[in-house]
Amino acid sequence: MTGVAAPERIARAVRADIRALTAYPVADAAGCIKLDAMECPYELPAEVRDDIARAARETPLNRYPAAANPALQAQVRQAFEVPAQAGLLFGNGSDELIHLIIQACCEPGDTVLSPWPSFVYFDMAARLSHARFVGVPLTAGLELDLPATLAAIEAHQPKVVFLALPNNPTGGLWPDAAVRAILDAAPGLVVLDEAYQPFAGHTWMPRIMDEPNAVVMRTVSKIGLAGLRFGYLAGHPAWIAEFDKVRPPYNMDVLSQAVLAAVLRHKPVLDAQADRLHADRQPLADGLAALPGVTVFPSAGNFVLARFCGKLDGNAVHLALKTRKILVRNFSNAHPLLADCLRISVGTPTENAAVLSALQDILSA
């Protein structure tokens, strides 16, 4: 086989659907105001960083992580009010948990369903596992279309339904009554993705043991620990036991576990940061809504989705912001319902003022 050109080898070895994909894009943020990834803009205080450094120094790196970490599980339960009776599974970010759920539940050709547009990885993880993804379009106002969702559940009988609460990238928080109807209709598992729960003031976590076909999935990425890559899944122990069977051995490295344990001893710091972003969201939304040709959608996350329908479209506004070294996420070409939409993370007051000032200049030029 020597002498065969690399592209030909790749074509023989790599799945056609993988070759057709593009890698997830991450913009170079050097020197920029970064409002494109829903990260917390605040660095941890010095005393927290000192505890992290101490924990890292004391962590042995020559041994694999323990299969279970009861002390960290107890910390996570207390910090995030996970019911004592619930099973708990850690993942290398919620992305890994999405993979584990689909791998455990879906045979090739089985259906994974979600309102759409939503978190793009629901679709990607399904397709990577040879499952069929069904996205049920939101309404023109980017609200949940409950009748269409229930009809799709009846028609496709999905093994897994993902509900992002609040939804990303739109920011909408679906009503409890609608979620209840989906839980009652779904023939398989319903995953309640609460990645943005700290900014929504609403959760299904206290009720999860009352829901035999649901689990709650969360991440620490949005509350100041995006670099840590830590997610957790809570639900009936029987569900968690099945997902644990497909978890890669040693999936959570010892440093991530040690750092999280150190940070959770300062949980009020994380709560205060989330509260601040929650408080700053509405002023940012109001400032955007006051701009000419801009429509702002209600958000329960740490971001605001805005549509630009004036003399400049979303692509042009995105490029103009980028030339000013302000990064926001452009969804203009991602889905017809998101035409001309930009998603702007809530930053510091200074960053929020900067993006509003830049947009004022761009739209009035």
UniProtKB/Swiss-Prot annotation:
* Enzyme Commission identifier(s): 2.6.1.9
Where are its TM segments located? none
What top-level branch of life does the organism fall under?
Bacteria
Residue list for modification N6-(pyridoxal phosphate)lysine: 222
Listed cofactors: pyridoxal 5'-phosphate
Q: Which family does it belong to?
A: Belongs to the class-II pyridoxal-phosphate-dependent aminotransferase family. Histidinol-phosphate aminotransferase subfamily.
Subunit architecture: Homodimer.
Which NCBIfam families does the entry mention? hisC
Full protein name: Histidinol-phosphate aminotransferase 2
